[in-house]
């Protein structure tokens, strides 16, 4: 987590070389970074508009070391988060009230199952077998395709060969070069989805302009307005490299 509000100008002994300290949860111009969502999500919601939903990962395999998906966290003050792959429901996640972030009013939610109920629907597995197979695939996703002894034991129990596991991994999780999936995250509050984030390949780019103080007042000092510009995709997601 960041330890101060915003980045700031500093002396030459910082490693960035531009005399700016980048410790803030916002940048010099008060544009929020990802860590700002951690703090924003600690607010107790009183209306749907108070719900925060920020997904840590862009879900773009080519943007990750070795194309390995790694961890995905959601920063939210919702009661739970539903994950969809395309139009298929995958799983619903709730905050871990006993985990390492249990002291927070609204702990970040780790999205650690990207297979969920899909194996029952598309592979014809029974519920118990689907849970074990999904555990294998999610572990491979987390551990860069390195099966643990437990996963190998599960494969033997399910009579799954390595080629069977690879086929399902390519289909339900994916690797570099495979068709990219659309993921939809829904924040659930009082039993209904009140905010949505969609992650999919970028199809269009537009420039968003937000004026934070639209009325300037003529007075004894100069008034000014903060204007923020962001490059966003078709779903309103920030494009950080533009």
Q: What residue spans do the PLM features occupy?
A:
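Short beta-strand/loop motifs in extracellular/secreted proteins, especially
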Residues: 79-82, 183, 227, 242
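Low-complexity, acidic Ser/Thr/Pro/Gly-rich terminal tails and inter-domain linkers that flank the onset
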Residues: 51, 201-220
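Short, solvent-exposed loop/linker segments at the N-terminal edge
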Residues: 61-67, 215-225
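Extracellular Ig-like/FN3 beta-sandwich strand-entry sites
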Residues: 178-182, 222-224
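Beta-strand-rich interaction surfaces with strong enrichment in secreted/lumenal proteins
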Residues: 172-175, 196-198
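Edge beta-strands of extracellular beta-sandwich domains
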Residues: 92, 191-205
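Extended substrate-binding grooves/exosites of carbohydrate-active enzymes
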Residues: 1-166, 186, 191-192
């Amino acid at each position: 987590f960041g330890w101060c509000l915003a980045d700031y100008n500093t002396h030459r002994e910082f490693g960035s070389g531009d005399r700016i300290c980048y410790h803030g949860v916002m940048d010099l111009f008060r544009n929020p970074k990802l860590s700002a969502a951690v703090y924003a999500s600690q607010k107790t919601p009183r209306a749907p508009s108070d719900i925060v939903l920020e997904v840590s990962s862009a879900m773009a395999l080519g943007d990750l070391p070795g194309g390995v998906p790694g961890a995905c966290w959601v920063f939210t003050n919702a009661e739970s988060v539903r994950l969809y792959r395309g139009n298929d429901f995958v799983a619903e996640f709730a905050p871990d009230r006993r985990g390492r972030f249990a002291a927070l009013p609204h702990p970040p939610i780790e999205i650690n199952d990207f297979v969920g109920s899909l194996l029952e629907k598309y592979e014809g597995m029974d519920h118990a077998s689907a849970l074990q197979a999904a555990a294998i695939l999610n572990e491979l996703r987390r551990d860069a395709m390195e099966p643990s002894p437990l996963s190998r034991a599960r494969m033997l129990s399910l009579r799954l060969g390595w080629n069977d596991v690879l086929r399902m991994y390519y289909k339900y999780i994916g690797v570099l070069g495979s068709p990219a999936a659309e993921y939809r995250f829904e924040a659930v509050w009082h039993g209904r989805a009140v905010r949505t984030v969609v992650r999919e390949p970028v199809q269009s780019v537009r420039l968003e302009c937000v004026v934070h103080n639209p009325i300037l007042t003529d007075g004894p000092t100069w008034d000014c307005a903060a204007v923020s510009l962001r490059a966003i995709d078709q779903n309103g997601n920030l494009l950080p490299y533009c």
